[in-house]
Curated annotation (Swiss-Prot):
Its EC number is 7.1.2.2. This is ATP synthase subunit alpha. It catalyses: ATP + H2O + 4 H(+)(in) = ADP + phosphate + 5 H(+)(out). One of its GO terms (cellular component) is proton-transporting ATP synthase complex. It comes from Exiguobacterium sp. (strain ATCC BAA-1283 / AT1b). SUPFAM superfamilies: C-terminal domain of alpha and beta subunits of F1 ATP synthase, N-terminal domain of alpha and beta subunits of F1 ATP synthase, P-loop containing nucleoside triphosphate hydrolases. The gene is atpA. The keyword DNA repair does not apply. It is found in: Cell membrane.
Length: 502
């Protein structure tokens, strides 16, 4: 066997030519302390605030505290596998979540990973979780209604697309039910819904998902769940992940509804992280920037101008109060950030008024201009009527002999309360709402016994579907109130067929 020197030298030259001498440089630090979802690392001198870092076991973290000599990192996942002395390296990226159509109908965690057992989510689009809110000139005033399907809200505290309406109340007063009914009612409205569950029991989230599925609402909904058993960093990030997923659709000219259930648990998780990071505590031990935490989240809700596609993102944040105290720190913060609030009262809830909306303390600051014209006309006096009824009701308990005017106000008030009651998961279309409230305010229900009001409404809705489809269609399509003759004619025609209980 002969060895040819030319072949060997040619082969060596080829190998040398293809040799790459690129050096991969990554800044690496060492974990010096770990526990409770927090790690401190030494050696990441150039890391930036909010930058994503990677631990040696593959778990990611977010750099939060940039101190002299060490960096405070919140760990996004299980911190049990990280120990003192492990390496941690910079990624040079900020945190992003997967977004897009592929997430619709899925249940994901705040990192965008599926937790519903239905396989991987295939999308190549990612959005950063923190983004600057749109400026004043990029926005348009709120002018389109968001129909919740709940009479008490659409009549008394209307919500517009792009608005931020706080839902506030004690635990077990029906806050989540209001949100679920609103999501179910968007079926015909071509709206994307995102339900963010923060610190909820996993069984509760499962119940919500099943309710949405049974009502055909899961097809246009994304559920982001950070359950109570998950570490505080994930509870803190969940709302930001939800709004980032929503912004993808808003930027494409679509309408989005994001429900944050609830932000008091996010504030508690943020307080926990801040105290572990040794940030100075303020009122109620919350850090000084807890207001900024919620304001930068809720400011991302917007109604965009036509040049940017005219999309909208409506936010329904929840706050849980303790013993109906809306003057506590977090409730007052969020009330001052939002465009109004719906206050659910436990006394009303337990007395059978459901949804338990306190009309006196609830307000919508911008929704009035977005209300359907027909509803605006018929529900104009409803709030005042209800307020004067509540006032008279308190006095009426002391004396029995009341003058005629007071008695008629009390009678009308009782019927108003009955009309505004509604069953669970039974949102009502705007035309049916307008007709029953018209019947109420014009006195057509004054001769119907209070106990029959709910039955009267149910039977009238069925009768209207059979005999007055054109009337309902006119209200739905034009948003205007038909002539008084047409309305009175429909109501009196139905009343002839209605038999009150003896």
């Amino acid at each position: 066997m002969t060895i040819k020197a030319e072949e060997i030298s040619a082969l060596l030259k080829e190998r040398i030519a293809s040799y790459g001498s690129e050096i991969e440089v990554s800044e690496t630090g060492t974990v010096i302390q770990v526990g409770d979802g927090i790690a401190r690392a030494h050696g990441l001198d150039n890391v930036m605030a909010g930058e994503l870092v990677e631990f040696s076991n593959g778990v990611m973290g977010l750099a939060q505290n940039l101190e002299e000599g060490n960096v405070g990192i919140i760990i996004l996942g299980d911190y049990k596998g990280i120990k003192e002395g492990d390496s941690v390296k910079r990624t040079g990226r900020i945190m992003e979540v997967p977004v897009g159509e592929a997430l619709l109908g899925r249940v994901v965690n705040p990192l965008g990973q599926p937790i519903d057992g239905l396989g991987p989510i295939v999308t190549d689009t990612y959005n950063p979780i923190e983004r600057k809110a749109y400026g004043v000139m990029a926005r348009k005033s709120v002018h389109e209604p968001l129909q919740t399907g709940i009479k008490a809200i659409d009549a008394l505290v209307p919500i517009g697309r792009g608005q931020r309406e706080l839902i506030i109340g004690d635990r077990q007063t029906g806050k989540t039910s209001v949100a679920i009914d609103t999501i179910i009612n968007q079926k015909e409205e071509n709206m994307i819904c995102i339900y963010v569950a923060i610190g909820q029991k996993e069984s509760t989230v499962r119940g919500v998902v099943e309710t949405l599925r049974q009502n055909g609402a899961l097809d246009y909904t994304i559920v982001v769940s950070a359950s109570a058993s998950q570490p505080a960093p994930l509870l803190y990030l969940a709302p930001f992940a939800g709004v980032s997923m929503g912004e993808y659709f808003m930027d494409r000219g679509q309408h989005v509804l994001v429900v944050y259930d609830d932000l008091s648990k996010q504030a508690a998780a943020y307080r926990e992280l801040s105290l572990l990071l040794r940030r100075p505590p303020g009122r109620e031990a919350y850090p000084g920037d807890v207001f900024y935490l919620h304001s930068r989240l809720l400011e991302r809700a917007a109604k965009l101008n036509d040049e940017l596609g005219g999309g909208s993102l409506t936010a329904l944040p929840f706050i849980e109060t303790q013993a109906s105290d809306i003057s506590a720190y977090i409730p007052t913060n969020v009330i001052s950030i939002t465009d109004g609030q719906i206050f659910l009262q436990s006394d009303l809830f337990f007395s059978g008024v459901r949804p338990a909306i306190n009309a006196g303390l609830s307000v919508s600051r911008v929704g009035g201009s977005a209300q359907v014209k027909a509803m605006k006309k018929v529900a104009g006096t409803l709030r005042l009527d209800l307020a004067s009824y509540r006032e008279l009701e308190a006095f009426a308990q002391f004396g029995s002999d009341l003058d005629k005017a007071t008695q008629s106000k009390l009678n009308r008030g009782q019927r108003t309360v009955e009309v505004l009651k509604q069953d669970l998961n039974a949102p009502l279309s705007v035309d049916k709402q307008v007709i029953i409230i018209y019947a109420l305010t014009k006195g057509h229900l004054d001769d119907i016994p209070v106990t029959d009001i709910r039955r009267f409404e149910t039977e009238m809705n069925a009768w209207l579907d059979q005999n007055r489809k054109d009337l309902c269609r006119e209200i739905r399509q034009t948003g205007n109130l038909p002539s008084d003759e047409a309305m009175v004619d429909a109501i009196t025609e139905f009343k002839k067929t209605f038999s009150p209980s003896v």
